[in-house]
């Protein structure tokens, strides 16, 4: 599937927002986001600059993101949940923001909750599981 550049940018932005919602970044989160940045076509210099200033960057707004297609939105929500739980806990801020983004894209909260439970039941697989985006591109 061809993913428009705006959706690519929003996908990465959304992952960055999700990662900073708990006011910390760990190595697992950084590694996951780096993989996404590369697959989405962003340079490693851009990634390094963005990630190094992520927590204090006030220019990254945190409004829920609207994607152009439901498949891209569902992929993002699933990957956002995997990223959020990669530090072994998922906070209310992370969950609420992902639910708001899902609802902005016409995705039911029940679907998000079900997907979150599926992922939480397999936390040991987070680093080994395929991310939803990778099946789209």
Outline where the language-model segments fall.
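Small-residue-enriched hydrophobic alpha-helices in membranes
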Residues: 1-137
């Amino acid at each position: 599937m061809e993913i428009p550049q705006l959706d690519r940018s929003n996908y990465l932005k959304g992952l960055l927002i999700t990662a900073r919602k708990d006011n910390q970044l760990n190595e697992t989160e950084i590694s996951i986001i780096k993989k996404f940045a590369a697959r989405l076509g962003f340079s490693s210099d851009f990634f390094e600059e963005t990630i190094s200033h992520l927590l204090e960057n006030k220019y990254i707004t945190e409004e829920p993101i609207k994607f152009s297609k439901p498949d891209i939105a569902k992929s993002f929500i699933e990957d956002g949940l995997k990223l959020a739980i990669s530090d072994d806990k998922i906070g209310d801020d992370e969950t609420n923001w992902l639910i708001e983004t899902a609802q902005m894209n016409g995705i039911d909260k029940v679907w998000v909750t079900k997907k979150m439970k599926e992922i939480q039941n397999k936390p040991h697989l987070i680093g080994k599981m395929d991310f939803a985006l990778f099946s789209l591109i």
